Design a protein with these regions (language model features):
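Conserved alpha-helix/loop element of class I SAM-dependent methyltransferases that forms part
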Residues: 19-20, 24, 37, 53, ...
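N-terminal auxiliary segments of SAM/dcSAM-dependent transferases
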Residues: 1-53
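Generic structural signal for secondary-structure transition and capping sites
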Residues: 22, 46-49, 136, 181, ...
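Short alpha-helical patches at coil-to-helix transitions and adjacent helical residues
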Residues: 10, 74-78, 100, 104
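Glycine-rich, flexible loop/turn motifs
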Residues: 46, 50, 55, 60-62, ...
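Conserved nucleotide-cofactor-binding alpha/beta core module
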Residues: 84-206
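SAM/dcSAM-binding transferase cores
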Residues: 1-20, 156, 174, 183-226
């Protein structure tokens, strides 16, 4: 499949995301996502961040397997989570769960610096290679336990988590700057919610449930490292 074919498929996907946003107005409180987010989604070629054999399916609005029992998230969910995060050009963003780097690349289009943690070494290596090939030099990838965050680079303006703990890990709350935002799926597998957490200037955290989701468990990922 040629790049022009991918371009047409990507444009169709962006239109689908826009339509789903309209239908999700009651959850999101608005009928359109930030144009900066949609522009970033348009700039990042999703087919470069999926396994080669799945490239023909890269622009279907669905999760896709990337190996090791993991998936690349549904593009609509990637767009919504990025929009909720409200990334600014001066922001340092912590991402938990690099996968093959698709969400990292979206964030890299918007932020000053992205720090991403991936538990599985092979996925982290593949992500680094893909990000480098696409010219995203403002992403640092670390192999490790995402529940611990990345203290050496904290505090962070924004935090995004792509696997679901039952409760928000305390280290991630601690490493979020006052005035910062975190987007994270959390809860039991049968009752997960996408959550927007905001830390006020006094350091208190408030949370808002956005809508039900289903992500892999962050605790399961931690168990793999023991």
């Amino acid at each position: 499949m040629s790049d022009p074919d991918f371009t047409a498929l990507q444009q169709h996907l962006l239109a689908e995301i826009a339509a789903k946003t309209i239908f999700s107005t009651s959850y999101l409180g608005k009928a359109a996502l930030d144009p900066r987010v949609m522009d970033a989604m348009a700039k990042v070629p999703r087919h470069e961040f999926v396994p080669l054999e799945l490239r023909p399916f890269a622009y279907i609005d669905t999760p896709l397997p990337i190996g090791y029992g993991k998936t690349i998230s549904q593009p609509f969910i990637v767009a919504v989570m990025t929009d909720l995060l409200d990334v600014q050009p001066t922001d340092a963003v912590l991402e938990i769960g690099t996968g093959l780097g698709y969400q990292s690349a979206i964030l890299a289009e918007l932020a000053r610096q992205v720090y991403s943690i991936e538990l599985i070494e092979e996925l982290a290596t593949r992500a680094m290679n893909r990000l480098a090939r696409q010219g995203h030099l403002n992403v640092d990838v670390k192999i490790g336990n995402g529940c611990h965050g990345w203290p050496e680079h904290a505090p962070f303006d924004k935090v995004i988590v792509t696997a679901a703990p039952e409760l928000i890990p305390p280290a991630l709350i601690y490493q979020l700057k006052p005035g910062g935002k975190m987007v994270i799926p959390a809860g039991l597998p049968e009752a997960q919610q996408l959550i927007l957490a905001e830390k006020d200037l006094g350091g208190s955290l408030s949370t808002k449930d956005i809508f039900p989701v289903l992500f892999s468990s962050l605790e399961d990922e931690d168990a793999e490292s023991r």
